[in-house]
Regions:
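Short beta-strands and strand-coil junctions in structured, solvent-facing domains, enriched
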Residues: 14-15, 36, 48-49, 76-79, ...
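Outer-envelope beta-barrel architecture signal
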Residues: 37-39, 99-103, 115-117, 126-130, ...
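Hydrophobic, lipid-facing positions within transmembrane beta-strands of outer-membrane proteins
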Residues: 24, 87, 101-105, 115-119, ...
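Short strand-turn segments of transmembrane beta-barrel domains in outer membranes
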Residues: 76, 88, 92-123, 133-134, ...
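Residues on the lipid-exposed face of transmembrane beta-strands in outer-membrane beta-barrel proteins
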Residues: 30, 119-123, 155-159, 202-206
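Extracytoplasmic beta-strand/coil segments of soluble accessory domains associated
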Residues: 2-46, 67
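Flexible loop and strand-edge segments within Gram-negative outer membrane beta-barrel domains
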Residues: 139-146, 150, 160, 164-214, ...
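Short acidic/polar hinge/loop motifs at secondary-structure boundaries
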Residues: 2, 46-73
């Protein structure tokens, strides 16, 4: 038998939340922290974390934008800084490699009025490529006052300058509303979050037979409105 090395906590059907009562905590080989300040999340090599608390916000990531997920287990602070004490998770975004157009759509509906919808369109024509994705997810939750709603979009444009050089830029925006009723023993009233997260990046890359390199710039931003039940 094998023991999993990566763990992620969940508090309900959908949505991890932030602040008091939040889930989405991740740990690699027992290291991660609560909140997850000891495990670094990257998107295409760019750090993703909330500036105030220093931890990633799991509800800000969209599955349709991801081509693959790379996991580096063990301390990696020499390369990635103090947030990578437990390891690194790198989300690699989609790229259209084959000539043509591909469109995908996923829709699911289940208990507690839970709805999941995702859409993606990928284009490759000559030297030009693009990826556009969108999603809308919601649920009433398995308890009263535990609703969650999320909608977001992602777009990437790329251009092959030559066989060895390419340039691309992308933007990702996600907004979600989450409610937390607290525990049955200690209920919370109006513990709501209204959070918008965004990122944009630009990169120039080269790939030769024996060498490769790149120059990239990125900018992350967010707006958070949180009523976490503190009493004065």
């Amino acid at each position: 038998e094998q023991v999993p090395g990566l763990f992620t906590t969940s508090r309900g059907i959908m949505g991890y939340g932030v602040s008091t009562g939040a889930a989405g905590g991740m740990s690699l080989r027992g290291i991660g922290g609560s909140p997850t300040a000891g495990l670094l999340v990257l998107i295409d090599g760019h750090p993703q974390y909330m500036g105030l608390m220093g931890h990633p916000i799991a509800d800000a990531y969209q599955s349709m934008m991801a081509e693959k997920v790379e996991v580096l287990r063990g301390p990696a602070s020499v390369l990635y800084g103090s947030n990578a004490m437990g390891g690194v998770i790198n989300i690699v975004t989609r790229r259209q490699q084959e000539e043509g157009v591909k469109t995908n759509m996923q829709v699911g509906y289940g208990s507690y009025n839970t709805l999941q919808t995702e859409f993606s369109n990928r284009v490759k024509k000559g030297r030009f490529s693009s990826v556009v994705t969108g999603s809308y997810n919601r649920t009433d939750g398995h308890r009263p006052d535990m609703g969650f709603e999320q909608y977001g979009g992602y777009a990437k444009l790329g251009y092959d300058i030559s066989s060895f050089w390419k340039v691309w830029g992308d933007v990702n925006v996600t907004h979600f509303n989450a409610s937390n009723p607290g525990t049955i023993q200690v209920p919370l009233i109006d513990n709501d979050s209204r959070i918008t997260r965004g990122m944009t990046s630009f990169a120039l890359e080269n790939h030769y037979e024996k060498t490769s390199g790149g120059l990239s710039f990125f900018y992350n931003w967010g707006r958070h409105k949180i009523n976490d039940g503190y009493q004065i």
